[in-house]
Curated annotation (Swiss-Prot):
Domain notes: The Q motif is unique to and characteristic of the DEAD box family of RNA helicases and controls ATP binding and hydrolysis.
Helicase C-terminal domain mapped to chain residues: 283-437
High-level lineage: Eukaryota, Fungi, Dikarya, Ascomycota, Pezizomycotina
Basic and acidic residues bias: start-end ranges: 574-597
A molecular-function term among this protein's GO annotations: ATP hydrolysis activity
Protein name: ATP-dependent rRNA helicase spb4
Record domain Helicase ATP-binding: where: 45-249
Disulfide bond sites: none
Role according to the record: ATP-binding RNA helicase involved in the biogenesis of 60S ribosomal subunits. Binds 90S pre-ribosomal particles and dissociates from pre-60S ribosomal particles after processing of 27SB pre-rRNA. Required for the normal formation of 18S rRNA through the processing of pre-rRNAs at sites A0, A1 and A2, and the normal formation of 25S and 5.8S rRNAs through the processing of pre-rRNAs at sites C1 and C2.
Xref: SMART domains: DEXDc (SM00487), DUF4217 (SM01178), HELICc (SM00490)
Length: 638
């Protein structure tokens, strides 16, 4: 990569950019409250506007969005002539629906200060009609947002054909579907710029193939910008994207030593707290109460979608009524995700977003004061992105990662090596045994009230363990070191699930809970009705329903065991016959002929071997008889 050229001025004033920004852009950023550029904006905007490919790595919350939106908009509005109908001039790709929506909202806020573009956007948002008639010589930016799950591909194409947007903000899958249409054009004469936001995530395996298909549909002669908080960890993949001698912009933050060794904002305090499993959830309440002033918005990260579903039921009971807890994960339907996201963003009372890594990247949620990582991320790269939801744009923020005592504490040194140092949580927190036991009983009370919540908890625990076992720092997060009983009690489980990992566990899998599983009911009447019907059917068929592991009957007669073995052998033989019949039916006549010849040859060999074994047995018997006869005692003649 080409080195970054020296800047002509040390000023970060917006009017000092070279080439100069348009007057309406200066008005827009001033109205948004941005008095001067952030370091990443001061570095990236001039380069991107000067027709350079850029790879931008900057700490999260440093203003990367405007770093690419302003150059893209300026480029489209400085063309010699408007882009042709149904031709695309620029594309911004984002890994998630939420982040794409956020970029689109910032874009429309920016374009509100450009009269021609604002007129088109306002019309398209209020009426489902083609864009208003303007002089064909008027340059304007017409954006379209493409999100999977919110509209159908046919609806997106219809909107594209009606409004003829020249700037697309999209998630990868939906963008590829639109570009695959013969009615959408991206020729070299029209297409100008491609932006990959959160570039390292877009280049992950889940998006790699889709991204490659998108790039095949775009001209190679284009300006490309890659923006992320950790671009350096995907350099090999970035080079293959097709950038031409890109300029790399790296913006870091000075640590306490004065060296540029941190990859997070200086306004963000990153800490860790060590708690045993039973103390983790009660400690959350202590954390919330220790932060002053009380956090208006907090984000709690867990590792799985099932974990969000289950903990969203029990955590409010442990935390109390002072905070509104809102769940969000990637398996929610698109409308539920958007609804819950908006609830959190617009919440006036203290709110907590309980989420997975779907909310860890790029989202600029205002006023997030606290981030708690209940589960450390399985991918260490995600750690910095989770922390970065707080402390954005200079606002003070606090991040806490919860660790179990022992080997997990080595994660602190691991993060230090990765230039994301964490300090001990500044306020000592001690969770008493009585408080931990009370939290367990509080959770179990709601679990006992509805068998559906029990099922949800069992699923969530298994899912959590699967995620834990796949941690990339596997030498630190070891399944063998887990406190099973402590974890089960912490989660409010009534028993430990059946899992291969518990095969050699010698502890109490019932967790000290006595339950009548036959009478343990679902609140949902239909589910309970089905359960009772199944219970009745099993009772009538002589089977006993139990959720515990079946214990062997120590008084079973040998004859019953022999009968069971005979039944199994018979079933095995029948299965083998069916498989052989299916194999025979698939054969050609020639194959059948060869198979018969082979079988006949094998029969001859078997017969020959059996005859040899028979002769050997006969000879052995004769030798034995002779030996026994020779040893007889002589008793004399008659």
């Amino acid at each position: 990569m080409a080195p970054k050229p020296p800047s002509g001025t040390s000023s970060r004033a917006w009017d000092a950019v070279n080439p100069p920004l348009s007057e309406w852009v200066l008005d827009a950023v001033s109205s948004m409250g941005f008095t001067r550029m952030t370091p990443v904006q001061a570095s990236a905007i001039p380069l991107f506007m000067a027709h350079k490919d850029v790879v931008v790595e900057a700490v999260t919350g440093s203003g990367k969005t405007l770093s690419f939106l302003i150059p893209v908009v300026e480029k489209l509005l400085r063309l010699e002539e408007p882009i042709k109908k149904h031709h695309v001039g620029a594309i911004i790709v984002s890994p998630t629906r939420e982040l794409a929506s956020q970029i689109y909202n910032v874009l429309t806020s920016l374009l509100a200060f450009h009269p021609a573009s604002a007129a088109v956007i306002n019309t398209s948002e209020t009426e489902d009609v083609p864009r208003p008639k303007h002089s064909s010589s008027v340059l304007r930016v017409v954006p379209q947002l493409l999100l999977g799950g919110s509209t159908s591909p046919a609806e997106d194409l219809s909107t594209f054909l009606k409004r003829s947007p020249n700037l697309l903000v999209a998630t990868p899958g939906r963008l590829l579907e639109l570009l695959s249409s013969p009615h959408v054009y991206c020729p070299q004469s029209s297409f100008e710029m491609l932006v990959l936001d959160e570039a390292d995530r877009l280049l992950d395996l889940g998006f790699k193939e889709t991204l490659q298909n998108i790039l095949r549909r775009l001209p190679k002669q284009r300006r490309t910008g890659l923006f992320s908080a950790s671009v350096s960890e995907a350099v090999d993949q970035i080079v293959r994207v097709g950038l031409r001698n890109p300029v790399k912009v790296v913006v870091k933050v000075k640590g306490a030593s004065g060296v540029d060794d941190k990859r997070t904002p200086a306004s963000l305090q990153m800490t860790y707290l060590t708690q045993p499993p039973t103390g983790k959830f009660p400690a959350l309440k202590h954390i919330l109460n220790s932060v002053q002033p009380t956090p208006s918005k907090s984000i709690f990260f867990v590792s799985t979608c099932s974990g969000v579903d289950y903990l969203s039921v029990i955590l409010p009971l442990i935390l109390g009524n002072d905070f509104q807890l809102i769940p969000l994960h990637g398996k929610h339907p698109a409308n539920v995700r958007q609804k819950n996201f908006n609830r959190f963003v617009n919440a006036h009372n203290p709110a907590i977003l309980l989420t997975t890594d779907v909310a860890s990247r790029g989202l600029d949620i205002p006023s997030v004061d606290l981030v708690v990582q209940i589960d450390p991320p399985s991918d260490p790269k995600t750690f910095i992105h989770r922390c970065g939801r707080a402390g954005r744009a200079g606002r003070r923020g606090l991040s806490v990662v919860l660790l179990h005592p022992g080997r997990e504490e080595d994660y602190v040194s691991f993060l230090e090596v990765r230039k994301t140092p964490v300090a001990p949580f500044p306020h000592p927190i001690t969770v008493s045994d009585a408080e931990a036991a009370a939290a367990t009983e509080t959770a179990r009370k709601v679990v006992k009230a509805d068998r559906a919540i029990h099922d949800r908890g069992q699923k969530a625990f298994v899912s959590w363990l699967r995620s834990y076992s796949k941690h990339q720092a596997s030498s630190i997060f070891r399944v063998a070191d887990l406190d099973w009983e402590g974890l089960g009690k912490a989660w409010g489980l009534l028993k430990l699930p059946k899992m291969p990992e518990l095969k050699n566990f010698k502890g109490d899998k019932t967790l000290g809970v006595q339950m009548d599983w036959d009478t343990y009911a679902y609140k949902d009447k239909q589910r309970e009705k089905r359960r009772l019907e199944l219970l009745q059917e099993m009772a009538e068929s002589g089977q006993q329903q139990t959720t515990n592991k079946k214990r062997p009957n120590e008084t079973v007669a040998w004859s019953n065991n022999a009968e069971n073995r005979n039944k199994k052998a018979k079933r095995r033989d029948m299965k083998q016959v069916r498989q052989e019949r299916k194999r025979w039916e698939k054969m050609t006549e020639e194959e059948k002929k060869k198979a018969l010849e082979t079988e006949q040859m094998l029969e001859q060999i078997r017969a020959k071997n059996e005859e040899q074994r028979r002769l050997k047995r006969a000879a052995a018997k004769a030798d034995k008889d002779a030996e026994e006869g020779g040893d007889e005692e002589f008793t004399g003649f008659d």
